[in-house]
UniProtKB/Swiss-Prot annotation:
Residue span(s) of domain HTH deoR-type: 3-58
One GO term (biological process): phosphoenolpyruvate-dependent sugar phosphotransferase system
Gene: srlR
Protein name: Glucitol operon repressor
Stretches assigned to coiled coil: none
Keywords, ordered alphabetically: DNA-binding, Phosphotransferase system, Repressor, Transcription, Transcription regulation
Keyword DNA-binding: yes
Spans traversing the lipid bilayer: none
């Protein structure tokens, strides 16, 4: 396993366990304590973990970590969610991609489509799209660059979305609350609101760790969401509550025929 893959796996392990020792991680990943300590130093510098005496815990104070760090968490689940999301795209579609780490996983899969129009405020997504060989039109809104999310925000960005109507919006989230709706830690969330208003269909992409979480800022109500793509870890009662709100819940790996 490559170091970056192992570091992503360590974060996923900590998501489940909360805290653990170096020895436990070394045994789980079949490697040495020295190797694990090197990984933990890198993750600590990234702000995603806090090292303790002989062990490590997730850094829960880092409520809105940089996009490069988010991509390391629940990577496999995000890839499966992205694969499911792409199945709802067709040649000729116009789509919005938000700047989330789950949505970012969609980009390599877009190479199969031609004559699609993609608007995004994410610099990472634009760079990745430019590497594809398919026929596409890429639109960016402009605005003020936010380094933490590698994306553009502000009034200029919001105004840009008001001038277009798109077929679909693919959007991630930091938390889904049955009462509050789709929420985020991102303090410059109003551009996400503008994206919702510009799309005929809102497709929410979230792994099951996001359910029941309520972040400070509300992007939209659940009534605004048409589809939710998630993994099999969703609580059945939570799924039923979402479906009662009219949301089509798609579970990765589950037949939806």
């Amino acid at each position: 396993m490559k170091p970056r893959q192992r570091q992503a796996a360590i974060l996923e392990y900590l998501q489940k366990q909360g805290k653990c020792s170096v020895e436990e991680l070394a045994q789980y990943f079949d490697t040495t304590g020295t190797t694990i300590r090197k990984d933990l130093v890198i993750l600590e510098h990234a702000g995603t973990v806090i090292r303790t005496y002989g062990g490590v815990v997730l850094n829960k104070e880092e409520s809105d970590p940089p996009i490069d760090h988010k991509t390391l968490i629940n990577t496999h689940k995000k890839e499966l969610i992205a694969e499911a999301a792409v199945s709802f795209i067709h040649d000729g579609d116009s789509i919005i991609l938000d700047a989330g780490s789950t949505v970012l996983q969609m980009v390599p899969l877009l190479s199969r489509f031609n004559n699609i129009t993609v608007m995004t405020n994410s610099l990472h997504i634009v760079n990745a799209l430019s590497e594809l060989d398919n026929e596409q039109t890429i639109l960016m809104p402009g605005g003020t660059f936010r380094k933490k999310s590698a994306s553009f925000h502000g009034q200029l960005a919001e105004n840009a979305f008001e001038h277009f109507t798109f077929d679909k919006l693919f959007m991630g989230t930091d938390g889904i609350d049955l009462n509050a709706g789709v929420t985020t830690f991102n303090e410059v969330y109003t551009v996400s609101k503008a994206m919702c208003n510009a799309a005929r269909e809102v497709i929410l992409m979230a792994d099951s760790s996001k359910f029941g979480r309520k972040s400070p800022n509300v992007v939209c109500s659940l009534e605004s969401v048409d589809k939710l793509i998630t993994d099999a870890g969703i609580d059945p009662a939570f799924r039923q509550a979402l479906e009662e709100k009219g949301i089509d819940v798609i579970i990765t790996g589950e037949s939806n025929e």
